[in-house]
Amino acid sequence: MRTSKKLPIVIAIISALLPASVFAQENINISQEQLEKLISQAVDKALAERDAKTTVQQSKADPITVEHKSVATPAVAPSPDMTIPYGFKFSAYARYGAHYQAGDEKYVSVDGSYNGSSGIGRLGNQGYGGEYSLIKTFKGENGAIWDANVMIEHWSDELNLKKAYVGVTNLFESQPNSYLWAGRDFHQRPSQEINDYMWMNHDGQGAGIKNFNINGILFDVGAVGSVESCDPKVVKAGDNPSRITCTGGSDTGDKGNYAVTSKIHGMKLGILDVAAYANYGFDSKAIDSDERKHAWQGALVLSHTTDHSMNQLISRYSDNSDNSVYNKTNGLHSTYISFDGMYTFNPHAMVRYLVAYQDYDNSKNPEDSRKNYAAIVRPMYYWNDIHSTWLEAGWQQVRYDEGGTNKGWKLTLSQNISFAMGPDFRPMLRFYVTGGQVDNQHTALITDTEDTRLDSLNVGAMWEVWF
């Protein structure tokens, strides 16, 4: 009954909007479904005609600027961001917390270690700080993709400008993936996770190119200078009310120590991935002539990755230097060999591990010559995608060529709350206890002391994040 009352009105609307052929039949029998469909079509047509009329009216009202280009206000140029995301990107790595010392050492550390306290294991055994970056990416009309980077670091009582560089990729048609950069950057700092060791480090300012492709082999080449550090001094009262020349952080110029660095990667040797490094260090005339030195180093890295494991073997030799050709020592020959990796038993259980050897041979100062041996293992169990328990055990021994051995062990139990399941997911809250013992016999011999043993017990709560 309600449908029959509405029918004349509907027919009137439809007859005004639809062609007459629709009603060619003498009898009209319309079901509820057909009726709703016709109403929908009619409404859509009416709205379309209304929009068309509105557009015509607006076009008549708007001033025509096509014929007056010479006097029209130019439109704002389109952003070069074009099809890539872009605005500013904020990224960071940081760790902060409380670390309570209840024993002899705040951080378990063997004297003469190749990497300080982290040489015996970093979990629950390292200081706090962070690195904070702002990155802006652009895409030019020619297709080149640019990025401008700035990083501030906080690892002491001051802030330092650690990165300030610009890079570009997709610049050369023949080398779309090559990356050309210039400025101040974290440069050539390959590292290991479980001992937090940068077995090469050439942070500085200069220029270079990465991923230059020659027949499938990738080349990285750079020329960089060590950044000058400011030496804080108290000066006479004058224009400087603080009477301090600087805070002791990074300066803006070069120090006078330079490095030419190179890396070849993207190579395969059977199932192994191969990477090779070669670096040369030298000094400018900013360094006194009797202090100028040369140094070089080379390294080979063999790595292999499967569905359940990641492993790498690192071999590095340095002449007149250790892990950086910036810092040169006449007569020093340093060899570093290490094997590290991770094995995943199942999504809930995995283990990281490392063994390392360093031969620090100083022919000009033989009493400083020593050999480092270290082993670290960290089994990890994930109860679910939030909670996990880690146990890290570390051992280290430093044998001096002349007189005595320093040695130690460390054990850390850590209960974690993390962003997701897995060793590389952050943010993470960590609650840990670390115990250990160090026996510095060599140190006691050269300092003429009797008490060589240091016992440690430390408790901490911290957070760690990277993104």
Model segments located where?
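Transmembrane beta-strands of outer-membrane beta-barrel proteins
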Residues: Y86-A94, A144-V150, S178-L180, I217-V221, ...
